[in-house]
């Protein structure tokens, strides 16, 4: 159990591990889908190629799009490419690195499907049975061209009466299946050789640029996650404060209307503070939320989000905040506790 917990924590802390896990999951789903696929070639001249090539290429396209959708870095890459420069320059090298990483993971599942289809050979036989040269086979010598085309169209359907138990059908099917498997194994070997060379030759070159681009691509992912988490934290605190101010205002109104009753033996009403205890505790505890409480109106939140998109701060913690642009210079005043802040928030 501890091993699974450690593995889960590692996947949560590493975006690359999560993406690799999703990539492997898509590949496994691809194998499962193909193994459960019911392949039925139409065995018609005009539709064999359309059906065979469609089954060979359409699912890989869908799997490629799924790979792009589930990869968080694909969205970050487009956002980084299209965002305004602001106070942070855009590095095209990082964008190219992210694009390469996204494409490598998105192409894994489609490649698995294509290799399975080629090694199985059914799609290839259906798609190219009409393209076989009849002169390579002696059994077609006594047939007219029209009979040959009709016969070749029926090759994928071994139970058809026209080609059942025909040596010519077996020869054509065997020829196309061998050709399909040869192409599949060639692609497999090529992919393995390219991956082997990339892994073995990369340490032979300077790793500085690679490490920099990998670092900053991970940084952008983590930065966006932390920004989203901080926004959720601020939204929760914002809603909490608004509700507390609403109850505090209602308490004051009820007191003004004389509808509030003092508890027996309690503290006199004149000695009670109108400030909600939750706000007083948060203000005095110094729990590190002052940077969140400074944003206390809808206009300030909108300005903050707009500034984050249009003018991200520079990657220099020593830089003065005044150099980051207008930011939140025109913030609305923060209302004191007990006032009607919930009417000012307009949320």
Curated annotation (Swiss-Prot):
Q: Describe PTMs of this protein.
A: N-glycosylated. Palmitoylated by ZDHHC3 and ZDHHC15. Palmitoylation positively regulates CALHM1:CALHM3 channel conductance.
Asked whether the UniProt record includes Cytoplasm among its keywords, one would answer no
Any idea where this protein resides? Answer: Basolateral cell membrane
Protein name according to UniProt? Calcium homeostasis modulator protein 3
Q: Name one GO molecular function term.
A: voltage-gated channel activity
Q: Its gene?
A: Calhm3
Does the keyword section mention Glycoprotein?
yes
Q: Where are the residues of the annotated region Central pore?
A: 9-36
Q: Which residues cross the membrane?
A: 21-36, 49-71, 99-124, 177-202
| Positions on the Cytoplasmic side per record topology | 1-20, 72-98, 203-347
What's any one GO cellular component for it? basolateral plasma membrane
Which residue positions carry a glycan here?
142
Q: How does it assemble?
A: Associates with CALHM1 as a pore-forming subunit in a hetero-hexameric channel complex.
Disruption phenotype annotation: Genetic deletion eliminates voltage-gated nonselective currents and taste-evoked ATP release in type II TBCs without affecting cell excitability or diminishing Calhm1 expression, and results in the loss of responses to sweet, umami and bitter tastes.
Primary role: Pore-forming subunit of gustatory voltage-gated ion channels required for sensory perception of sweet, bitter and umami tastes. With CALHM1 forms a fast-activating voltage-gated ATP-release channel in type II taste bud cells, ATP acting as a neurotransmitter to activate afferent neural gustatory pathways. Acts both as a voltage-gated and calcium-activated ion channel: mediates neuronal excitability in response to membrane depolarization and low extracellular Ca(2+) concentration.
Lipid modification (S-palmitoyl cysteine) maps to 99, 200, 204
């Amino acid at each position: 159990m501890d091993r699974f917990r450690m593995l889960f924590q590692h996947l949560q802390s590493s975006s690359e591990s999560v993406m690799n896990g999703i990539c492997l999951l898509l590949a496994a789903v691809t194998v499962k889908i193909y193994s459960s696929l019911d392949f039925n070639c139409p065995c018609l001249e005009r539709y064999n190629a359309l059906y065979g090539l469609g089954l060979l290429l359409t699912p890989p396209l869908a799997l490629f799009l799924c790979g792009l959708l589930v990869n968080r870095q694909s969205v970050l890459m487009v956002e980084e490419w299209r965002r305004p420069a602001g106070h942070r320059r855009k590095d095209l090298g990082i964008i190219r690195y992210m694009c390469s990483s996204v494409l490598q993971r998105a192409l894994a599942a489609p490649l698995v499907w294509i290799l399975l289809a080629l090694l199985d050979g059914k799609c290839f036989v259906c798609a190219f049975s009409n393209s076989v040269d009849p002169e390579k086979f002696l059994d077609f010598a006594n047939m007219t061209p029209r009979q040959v085309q009709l016969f070749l169209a029926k090759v994928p359907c071994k139970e058809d009466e026209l080609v059942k138990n025909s040596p010519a059908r077996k020869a054509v099917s065997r020829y196309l299946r061998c050709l399909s498997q040869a192409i599949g194994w060639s692609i497999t070997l090529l992919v393995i050789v390219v991956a082997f060379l990339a892994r073995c030759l990369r340490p032979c070159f300077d790793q500085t640029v690679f490490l920099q681009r990998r670092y900053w691509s991970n940084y952008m992912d983590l930065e966006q996650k932390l920004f989203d988490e901080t926004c959720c934290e601020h939204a929760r605190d914002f809603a909490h404060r608004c509700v507390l101010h609403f109850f505090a205002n209602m308490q004051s109104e009820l007191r003004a209307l004389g509808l509030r009753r003092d508890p027996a033996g309690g503290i006199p009403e004149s000695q009670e503070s109108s400030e909600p205890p939750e706000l007083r505790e948060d203000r005095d505890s110094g729990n590190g939320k002052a940077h969140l409480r400074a944003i206390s109106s809808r206009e300030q939140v909108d300005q903050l989000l707009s500034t984050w998109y249009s003018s991200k701060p520079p990657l220099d913690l020593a830089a003065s905040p005044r150099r980051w642009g207008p930011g939140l210079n025109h913030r609305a005043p923060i209302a004191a506790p007990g006032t009607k802040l919930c009417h000012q928030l307009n949320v």
